Structure formats: C-alpha cells, structure tokens
C-alpha cells in the first residue's frame, strides 16, 4: 500500500514538471520471482524510478523499454525468463527461477481515467476496490489493452470500450460476482487470447494506537514503514504530539470518555491498547466492543485482559474474545 502512495506522489512530481511517464506493472508470474503480480514502477522520461518490479535486476532493462513506450505512446508487454541459465543478459544473475510478464503503459495526462488516476481513485476512499488490467501473452508483440477499469462499491471508473463486446459481457459478469479475497488472473480461451488481471486494492490498515509512551514510539515507526495509517490516542498532551509521533495522520487527546467519541473505525481498522492505564483502557475497550474490528491487541499480562473483560461483564457488556489478542 505504501508503494502505491509513493507511486502517486512520484506521478504528481513528474506531472508538475511536465514530464512524460510510463507505468510498469507485473501482471503475471510463472514460477519464482522477487515481486508478485501488482508490483509497479513509475518511469519518467528523464529516467526517474518510483517503485520496484524486482529485486533490482530488471529495473535497468525495464527503464529502457519504458522510455520506448513513452516515445511510441503504446502499451507494451515484456517477458523476462529467469529460468534461462544465461541470465547474465539482464545485467546480473537474477537468482530467480520464474517467468515475469511486465506490462508497460504510457500515462496520457489528457486521459481522465489513465492507470495512475484509477489507482488514485482506489485510494481515495476507505473501501475495497477492484482494478482490472487486460493483456495478451499470445499476441505479446501487438499493442496491449492495459489498465482500464476500477470498481469500488457501487462506483465504476473507466470502461471496457477498448475490448471486443463479447469480452465485455464476460468480464463484467466476473466483476459483479467477484468475491475472492486475493488477486487472480483469468483467461477466456473460448473468446480468444486475452488475459485479465483482477487486482484487489484494500485501503491502508488504520491503527488506533492508544498510548503515547516511549514503548509506542517504535510501534509508530513500524506502522510508517509498513504504510499503515496511524491514529494516536492518549490523555497526556505532553506526550501525544507530532514532535514525538510525526507519522501520525491524526492525534486525539483527552479523557477516555471524550476520545472514544472521536474514533474512526471500519473493517480495516485495528486497535492497540498501550496506555498502561487500566481505567482508561477499560473505557476504551467498552467502546471497541461495539465496533467490528478484526484485531484488538492489549499490552500486558493475560490476567490484565481477564480483569478488563470481567469488569465489562459485570456491567452487562459481552466481549467477543475472537478479536482480542492478549498479550498483544
């Protein structure tokens, strides 16, 4: 997720400078490779790279091909066969044993729904999005279709107008019934040679970090490295600030009764209770039991969590333990 955010930032910088760009996307991997389908790299006409498509082995060659795509303004499919023992042709030994198919698309700034804009839209709302990219291995030398459609909730962006009508119906049906929890590639042999990469783009994980003590500092740093969205919550104003937690996108300060009214949660939100304040966490946990969170981590010994649950049950509040992880 962090890589997609960096990709958009790199795009904005290049756009501000009026630079032409191309987007390289790993669309299919057969065998072993450093990156899986969905890995991306943005290339500018000046050769600036944002993101990565391998462990550093393919970037040089992909850069040269991307600049060709920028010049020709036509999508290109490139295949790297790292099962070939003569992998020195890519510059260094790859250390892989797979075949990587890379789609390189020009970014047309005059087009409202080009691939980067579709990705931007996917990240604009905290809702799972489905991105559709179409390519053909059988006609790899021909111009490719590319990333053309995004579905997020009831909203649609882009279209299937670039592909034959018989494909449109089949892919639309697939989109409407897509319920899988992971990416997949679908071929339609009865229709022809096209392959479709269905890619799920979830919103970044939001971490509600309760506690601004010194032990919360490395947790915040890890959240930033992983590209998570951090909300810091604490009653101690001297500790809960941007100087100590510069990566926090939101800081909520105040008594427990006040902060619980300001919590923003969804199915992609997790909570970490690290305040070292039993009464504070008791009130917080009381509120969190009413939210559909997949993970609530509680710092401290198991007996502390048992005591918290016991206090809540005495108040007639039922606590579902499936989402509780204690010790954290």
What are these model-predicted stretches?
Residues 242-245, 262-264, 282-285, 309-310:
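Short, well-ordered secondary-structure micro-motifs
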């Amino acid at each position: 997720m962090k890589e997609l955010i960096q990709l958009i930032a790199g795009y904005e910088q290049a756009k501000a400078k009026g630079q032409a760009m191309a987007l390289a996307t790993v669309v299919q991997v057969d065998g072993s490779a450093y990156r899986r389908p969905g890995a991306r790299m943005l290339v500018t006409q000046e050769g600036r790279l944002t993101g990565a498509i391998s462990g550093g082995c393919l970037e040089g060659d992909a850069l040269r091909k991307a600049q060709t795509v920028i010049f020709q303004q036509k999508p290109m499919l490139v295949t790297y066969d790292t099962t070939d023992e003569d992998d020195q042709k890519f510059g260094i030994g790859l250390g892989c044993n797979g075949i990587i198919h890379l789609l390189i698309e020009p970014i047309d700034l005059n087009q409202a729904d080009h691939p980067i804009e579709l990705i931007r839209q996917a990240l604009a709302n905290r809702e799972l999005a489905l991105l559709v990219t179409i390519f053909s291995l059988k006609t790899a030398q021909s111009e490719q279709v590319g990333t053309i459609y995004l579905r997020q909730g009831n909203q649609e962006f882009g279209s299937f107008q670039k592909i034959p009508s018989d494909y449109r119906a089949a892919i639309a049906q697939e989109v409407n019934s897509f319920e899988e929890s992971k990416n997949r590639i679908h071929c339609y042999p009865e229709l022809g040679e096209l392959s479709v990469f269905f890619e799920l783009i979830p919103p970044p994980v939001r971490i509600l970090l309760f506690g601004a003590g010194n032990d919360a500092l490395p947790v915040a740093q890890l959240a930033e490295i992983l590209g998570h969205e951090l909300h810091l919550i604490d009653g101690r104003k001297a500790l809960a600030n941007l100087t100590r937690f510069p990566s926090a996108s939101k800081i909520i300060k105040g008594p427990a009764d006040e902060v619980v009214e300001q919590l923003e949660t969804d199915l992609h939100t997790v909570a970490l209770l690290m305040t070292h304040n039993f009464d504070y966490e008791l009130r917080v946990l009381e509120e969190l039991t009413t939210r559909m969170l997949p993970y609530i981590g509680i710092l401290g010994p198991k007996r502390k969590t048992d005591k918290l649950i016991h206090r809540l049950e005495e108040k007639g509040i039922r606590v579902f333990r499936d989402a509780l992880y204690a010790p954290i």
